[in-house]
């Protein structure tokens, strides 16, 4: 993302750590803009971006493995502060002349370190708890470096070259298990890099609107409206930037929540005076999905069909060159990067055909979900719309496990409406990050009245989270869960059992498919 010259930037280089997005997230929480880029970024690109600081993320590899990730050592000569985290510290040590070796056993979990530094650890207790996760260890630091923290298991828990402003820590300050991790990152960003912390959603809007106007010119844009928070925010942002050059295409694929289609037309078509075309493509999608049970295949089919529908609609319009989507940072990450294994393909980034005729515009693909909500409020979208439940592009298609049928969709649609109603009545909307029902491909025996039943099981998924990268199951009061269960079993046909998902992310993802 191209930033205005006055915008402070902390550049995070990705070496494949499962935590690397958290680094970016923590820095943004300080009001400083941060981006995650591949470790192969060139020196020229870095100079052009003009970051105030560079952070080298952790990673699962050893610095001595064949083909292990590395960087251009010239990074250390740019005069820009550098902080290496775990793998980033080991790589820094190796590239600058120190020594690293394979540890006898992997160090994983909490550890106590003792610190001594007036920069990274300024204002922090000398003894603190951190989260270790590494298999290599530093045995000799480069010339010019000093030890600023040690632990019972390592003499080099943190190091610094204060003159060149190069630092390394053998633990993960970005995870919440590290007691003063945010404070350490804040010291690096504020004290070492001298960032003022002026990144706001207001700034983001100004920059993004200018980018959109420069790129689009007098051409036209189609926006994929799904009814979810992300695509709604994208539509309003684009409308603010280019007005009537925007045409929103709302594809009603028959996989929407109860009442979703009418709500979209009323709130955005009438409320924001947008040009929205509603396309009834239910039969088209259902025919494509008939007999398909594999979740990845379902996502690909839905993503492809979305684009083909857009193609059909665009052919009826003149001068449409761009397709806008509500892709988030987490969507891009979960679809896999050079250093990250694909967890699941996201329909916005993984299902697009190679011969697609549109150029993509993804104006919020560097934002996390909570940042998108803040952006929505700043854009003037009513709170009740901004705080609507996240809804994936494939819709209920990935909340019906296995093959999709009309009857199964109706079960999920009605049970989900009951869940959302009870959560709202109990005042839990803001406490729970995301909640929805799923229909596993499971039937079980039950008794209703005097009769034996053999019907469907509905699963409830409700999680708490800050940014969607990690989550835990919500501790909903048992009486509330009982109310939800009772209503679903009594009001939704062909359901005789309700279960509650008590799994965190990781190891599970929030969605079941």
UniProtKB/Swiss-Prot annotation:
- EC top class named in words: ligase
Entry-linked Pfam families: GATase, GMP_synt_C, tRNA_Me_trans
Q: What residues does the GMPS ATP-PPase domain cover? A: 199-388
Q: Which InterPro entries match?
A: Class_I_gatase-like, GATASE, GMP_synth_C, GMP_synth_GATase, GMP_synthase, GMPS_ATP_PPase_dom, Rossmann-like_a/b/a_fold
Task: Describe the reaction catalysed, as an equation.
Answer: XMP + L-glutamine + ATP + H2O = GMP + L-glutamate + AMP + diphosphate + 2 H(+)
User: What are the entry keywords?
Assistant: ATP-binding, Glutamine amidotransferase, GMP biosynthesis, Ligase, Nucleotide-binding, Purine biosynthesis
SS bonds (residue pairs): none
Q: Please name the Gene3D superfamilies in this protein's record.
A: 3.30.300.10, 3.40.50.880, HUPs
Q: Residues that bind ATP, according to the entry?
A: 226-232
Glutamine amidotransferase type-1 domain spans which residues?
9-198
UniProt pathway annotation: Purine metabolism; GMP biosynthesis; GMP from XMP (L-Gln route): step 1/1
Q: Where along the chain is the active site annotated?
A: 86, 172, 174
Report the protein's function.
Catalyzes the synthesis of GMP from XMP.
Subunit structure, briefly?
Answer: Homodimer.
Protein name as catalogued: GMP synthase [glutamine-hydrolyzing]
Lineage, highest ranks first = Bacteria, Bacillati, Bacillota, Bacilli, Bacillales
Q: Which gene encodes it?
A: guaA
